[in-house]
Amino acid sequence: MNIFMVGDVFGEPGRAALKKLLPRLRRQHEIDVAVVNVENAAGGSGVMPPMIREFLDAGADVLTSGNHIFKKKEIISAIAKENLLLRPANYPPGTPGSGYVTMKAGPYRVGVLNLMGRIFMEPIDCPFRKADEIVPELAREARVILVDMHAEATSE
């Protein structure tokens, strides 16, 4: 299985590069699943709803995020409807959107889990405890589990 993960796509130059390169990279490397962190796609902070379709049309399968996901208020209603745009799973209960998804990629089912670290970040639930809770659930549905850990410290 060939996996492509990239982040953070930053602003218009990052969006343009991804739109230009991802289709070719998918063909050239026979990529089965492409996960793209988009939390800084709107001018370096946040993401706007129309960008979701741009990324998916360019070949991204799942969009992940981090602490800037809700910087643009317009994303709140979009993230509640779009299950391929993830926010960190360790955000408090009741936060719009989901922190994980499963999907078919070639012959496999793939789970993608989005977590956020706590060092040098705003207070949030423990990502490791949240992973311990969610990974077994994903493992019941998916043979492959990818984790996007958005963090400031490599120790996390």
Q: Can you say where each PLM-predicted feature lies in the sequence?
A:
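Acidic, metal/ion-coordinating pockets
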Residues: 1-156
